[in-house]
Regions:
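N-terminal hydrophobic/helix-forming segments and targeting peptides
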Residues: 1-378
């Protein structure tokens, strides 16, 4: 019996053909990331993949009035969180095996009236969501995702900057020759939240009629004209719209050996995707299997699409009712008897920044899944 614990490098212990399986999984995950730039797009991608793997809409299952071992169900909660359930042989009252992850990620949201003109440029005012290093958002290509509800009730889906033939957006920074004062500031103050203004245009609207008055804010006017022409929206529609700014880059392999992945949203879509593929492999479990994909973790799990909401509890209550005589006690027992794995990312040891971790107790890259015994410290 070995008395000492030895952490093993996964790469060194792969069996024949397992490297191909690892790389195939990585490529599927990268495709998932590219289709899941926001929590809304991620939820839609999860549902699409779930349907392809035999999962039925929760509301349609309720209409049938019955469930049985092996029934696969998905719940779409406001297009921002998803629950996937595979009914087990034992009753729900006996408990569930649950893996929970979150599908929101740090980003920039547009303010209610974001568009303005200054210095012959049109810009968008933003409000950062989650914990962001503000300086990291300057001078990188950005894409815009969102939905707009117009006055006549139409829902318009917008995505700009993801395809090669589409424009991208930028947040400006100072050139080095003018940065003397900025460079003296603390890193956290070099770029402020109020400076995270997204450049969306520079070309002014020019009046064809020479007799017509000069257009006020002609660059802003031109951007509004483009938006109206392409999507049928006006400035007032921004109030009811939901727009998110995220990095436009696609997921890429990192390293000459393609052993790592660069992408926005690893936290926590890496765990979300693992939970997704895992439940797709479940057929008729002994205990009901659940994968949860929830929103708003980055800002404290508040709101009706987060884990603080009742959407999952309500779902389980309805499913228990389909299994027989309903009672609140059965719902309480179902949760009390359940086992839950909270699947989120943690930090791996980085030799460039060794001072932030206790190396003897740090997760090592390439050494498999990590269990975090404590968290929350900065």
């Amino acid at each position: 019996m070995a008395l000492k614990h030895e952490s093993k490098n996964v790469w060194k212990n792969l069996k024949e053909n397992e490297l191909d399986l690892v790389m195939d999984y990585a490529n599927r995950y990268m495709a998932f990331l590219d289709n899941s730039k926001t929590e809304r797009r991620c939820a839609n991608e999860i549902i699409k993949l779930a349907k392809n793997n035999g999962f039925e809409d929760y509301n349609e299952v309720l209409k049938t009035g019955k469930i049985e071992p092996g029934t696969k169900i998905y719940l779409n909660n406001k297009e921002k969180s998803v629950a996937l359930v595979v009914i087990g042989k034992q009753s729900l009252e006996s408990g569930m095996n649950i893996v929970g992850s979150h599908i929101d990620a740090p980003r920039l949201d547009l303010k209610p009236f974001p568009l303005y003109e200054d210095g012959n440029m049109a810009l968008l005012k933003t409000h950062y969501y989650g914990g962001v290093k503000k300086y990291q958002w300057t001078c990188i290509p950005l894409s815009l995702h969102g939905i707009v509800f117009t006055k006549d009730g139409n829902k318009i889906d917008i995505s700009i900057g993801e395809n090669q033939d589409e424009p991208v957006f930028y947040i400006n920074d100072l050139l080095i020759h003018l940065s003397a004062d900025q460079m003296q500031k603390k890193l956290s103050e070099g770029i402020t939240g109020e400076q995270l203004n997204v450049v969306v245009g520079h070309r002014p609207m020019i009046s064809i009629d020479s007799e017509e008055k000069e257009i006020k804010d002609p660059v802003k006017e031109n951007i509004l004209h483009i938006l109206n022409e392409k999507y049928g929206i006006i400035e007032e529609d921004f109030m009811l719209a939901e727009f998110e700014i995220v990095p436009a880059d696609k997921a890429r392999h990192v390293g000459l050996d393609s052993s790592m992945i660069s992408a926005h949203g690893h936290d926590d879509r890496v765990c979300a995707y693992a939970g997704l593929e895992a439940i797709f492999d479940v057929e008729i479990p002994e205990i009901t299997a659940v994968s949860l994909f929830v929103d708003k973790e980055e800002i404290g799990s508040v709101g009706n699409t987060s884990m603080e909401s009742k959407f999952f509890e309500n779902m389980i209550a309805e499913l228990i009712a389909l299994q027989g005589e309903y009672s609140d006690l059965k719902v309480r027992r179902a949760f009390a008897n359940s086992k839950v794995l909270s699947a989120d990312v943690t930090v791996g040891f980085d030799p460039t920044f060794p001072e932030v971790l206790d190396k003897k107790n740090a997760a090592m890259i390439g050494h498999g899944v990590t269990i975090s015994k404590y968290t929350g410290a900065r």
